[in-house]
A protein has these predicted regions:
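Bacterial N-terminal signal peptides
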Residues: 25-37
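N-terminal cap/lid segment of alpha/beta-hydrolase-fold proteins
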Residues: 292-343
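C-terminal subdomain of alpha/beta-hydrolase-fold enzymes, centered on the catalytic histidine
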Residues: 411-414, 473, 477-648
């Protein structure tokens, strides 16, 4: 797993007084000069980058045999930098022309010993057409970093190799690597939105990234050696081609310290499993069982409540591994409230997604207000919550060992399929319930209209619920508050990661770099059930009615519980305009658009109204509770009311 990084010895004499770092910089400039002299002329170079080997990993042997485990330009942890097209081989039927070929030796024996086979690298990566559109990219550096320099615009650069366009990124000193028992220095890079499907990217660390002593991070000597290697050698060809692409993108190649390139997997291939599940679910009815009915006597305009169960599929094999082909029956408890409005008309149905540590009973707090607006309300428990804790072998605070790694990954996918089946149950079986009418008793007509459905998720319900909002083919409206696009991203970036012990998932890693790599692998495994896979579905009109989803996304700037970058990512992927209140803060990737939040497609953002005087913990926590902000409550209420009065 780990090996010392070899360095190239450059002989010196009593006359040589040039500092090593300066010497390397000069050599890199010379190498680039030779590349330009022997290759295309400057005008040609400006118009087209060298045609790269479509599968450089196969060419250098990194992905041969049992698969990739070590980057030929690797650092002390030789799998890094990651991701890398060195882990690919050519495939004529792949939509990207590539397939990943990764060995379980990407992880140390110590880490693999705590993972089931289906959660090891080969099972997660092999055969996919590229890497995650969410990243993250990881570089390891040998010395402690100046944290502020990571935020500099030119310290870490990622650009599209085809267009040269730079990508908005979130570069960070990885907390897992820093806090690990055997700490390392890892720079982790997430896209602020996504890396585009099917595109190839080049990522570099430059001399803008500083160590704590103020000096630039050193050159990776394996890269220097490759640049000065045999010009016919595959690795040298790769290094020089990437160097030329860096120059074409407007960056001085002499500034490069480390470098990787990678191709993003294909969207259609990634989304296919869930799209197949959607077709399967919508091909029939979803059974329910009614266990108890409670007469609410019209209090707060509520007619009756039902405790019941819905049949879903347990997609988690023993050990928690997600298997989207699994169809083990699983009955989930639900609570349903039907308002008195159902005595006179079929009422729309509101699906409620609860917050972290709560359960389906959270919806009961809004029964009264939603009943007055004429909504029926239904809710189920999220994985690891409420009635599901025993089945899932613990709540979200139970992730205290690497053995729980599969459960963390599969929680998002299980929630997605559960809610797709709940929506279909509302359309086919729940909506057929008839227990009230003009006289307060059944009248032979269904009480609910299953074709008019809304979803509202708050906090956890707006994170694991976000893929459902994007993928659900017949949902009419959705409201999310302090949510995000990216389940693993949100876990990795939450200030609560230690509170729910998600950091202990990586306890069996041999060092901090491997711990970071494990979380990156979790993201790749989650792609098939994550928001980006369904970004092309959210604006599609319903086949049955032609209606489009109406969407309101509320996020809170400064939120460190559900990190606010994830909220902005969801807004951009959904293509919704930001309508206020106020102007976005510095660092935002969205701009304010004139409009009305109740117009159907909107994102709102709130700043922390409490100031910065409370200290880092409360400053990160208080923006998250913005869902109790009267301003947000007013916008949500207006948005919801207009759907009842104007659209339905």
């Amino acid at each position: 797993m780990t090996s010392p990084t070899p360095t190239r010895r450059i002989s010196s004499s009593s006359h040589a007084t040039i500092k090593p770092a300066l010497k390397v910089a000069i050599l890199l400039l010379l190498a680039f000069s030779v590349l330009v002299a022997l290759g295309p002329g400057p005008s040609d170079l400006a118009g087209a980058s060298p045609d790269p080997d479509p599968a450089p990993g196969a060419a250098v042997g990194a992905a041969a045999g049992d698969g990739y485990s070590c980057n030929p330009l690797g650092t002390a942890t030789c799998a890094l930098p990651w991701p890398s097209n060195f882990a690919t081989h050519a495939d004529g039927v792949s939509p990207t022309g590539l397939r990943l070929n990764v060995s379980d030796a990407l992880f140390s024996p110590e880490l693999n010993a705590h993972l089931p086979g289906a959660s090891r690298p080969s099972a997660i990566y092999d055969g996919t057409s590229g890497f995650s559109p969410m990243g993250p990219i990881m570089f390891e550096v040998p010395a402690a970093l100046d944290r502020e320099s990571i935020q500099a615009r030119d310290s870490v650069v990622v650009f599209n190799a085809r267009t040269g366009e730079r990508v908005a990124i979130q570069a960070q000193h990885d907390a897992l690597a820093y806090d690990d028992e055997v700490s390392t220095n890892v720079v982790k890079v997430w896209p602020r939105v996504t890396f585009q499907w099917g595109e190839r990217y080049v990522a570099i660390i430059t001399d803008g990234l500083k160590q704590t002593d103020g000096q630039p991070v050193p050159h990776e000597m394996k890269l220097v050696n490759a640049l000065f290697g045999d010009p016919n050698a595959p690795l040298t060809k790769w290094a020089r081609a990437r160097q030329a692409e860096v120059a074409k993108a407007g960056i001085d190649p002499a500034r490069i310290r480390q470098m990787t390139d990678f191709t993003v997997r294909d969207q259609a291939e990634t989304a296919a499993p869930i799209k197949g599940i959607i077709d399967e679910i919508w091909s029939g009815d979803v059974p329910i069982r009614i266990n108890a009915v409670h007469d609410l006597h019209g209090v707060a305009e509520m007619d009756y409540a039902i405790e019941g169960e819905m049949l879903t599929w347990q997609l988690r094999a023993p050990g928690g591994v997600m298997d989207l082909n699994r169809r083990e029956p699983l009955w989930l408890k639900f609570d349903l409230m039907v308002p008195t409005a159902a005595r006179h008309r079929q009422v729309p149905v509101y699906i409620s997604g609860h917050s972290l540590t709560l359960d389906r009973n959270q919806a009961r707090a809004s029964w009264g207000s939603l009943a007055t607006e004429g909504f029926a309300v239904i809710a189920i428990d999220q994985p690891h919550h409420g009635s599901r804790v025993r089945e899932d072998l613990g709540d979200l605070t139970s992730f205290q060992a690497t053995e729980r790694f599969p459960w963390l990954i599969s929680a998002g996918g299980q929630s997605l399929v559960d809610h797709l089946r709940l929506l279909r149950a509302v359309e086919t079986t729940v909506s057929q319930i008839d227990r009230t009418g003009p006289s307060g008793t059944s009248d032979g007509k269904p009480d609910m209209d299953g074709s008019r459905t809304s979803y509202e998720g708050v906090s956890l319900g707006a994170v694991v619920g976000m893929p459902f909002v994007f993928a659900a083919p017949t949902l009419d409206a959705a409201i999310t508050t302090v949510g995000a696009a990216g389940w693993i991203y949100s876990v990795a970036n939450s200030m609560l990661v230690e509170v729910i012990h998600a950091d202990k998932i990586a306890n069996s890693a041999v060092n901090g770099s491997e711990a970071a790599l494990l979380i990156g692998t979790a993201q790749h495994a989650s792609d098939v059930v994550d928001v980006p896979a369904f970004a092309d579905m959210i604006r599609r009109a319903r086949a049955d009615s032609g209606r489009q989803l109406r969407l309101l996304l509320n996020h809170s700037w400064g939120d460190q519980v559900v990190y606010w970058y994830g909220g902005e990512r969801a807004s951009v992927l959904a293509g919704v305009p930001y309508v206020g209140p106020g102007a976005p803060p510095a660092g935002s990737i969205i701009t304010k658009t004139t409009g009305d939040a109740s117009g159907g497609w909107a994102a709102t953002g709130y700043r922390d109204a409490y100031g910065d005087w409370m200290g880092p913990t409360l400053n990160g926590l208080m923006p998250h509770v913005s869902f109790v902000n009267p301003g947000i409550a007013k916008i949500v209420g207006e948005f919801r009311h207009r759907f009842v009065s104007e659209n339905w």
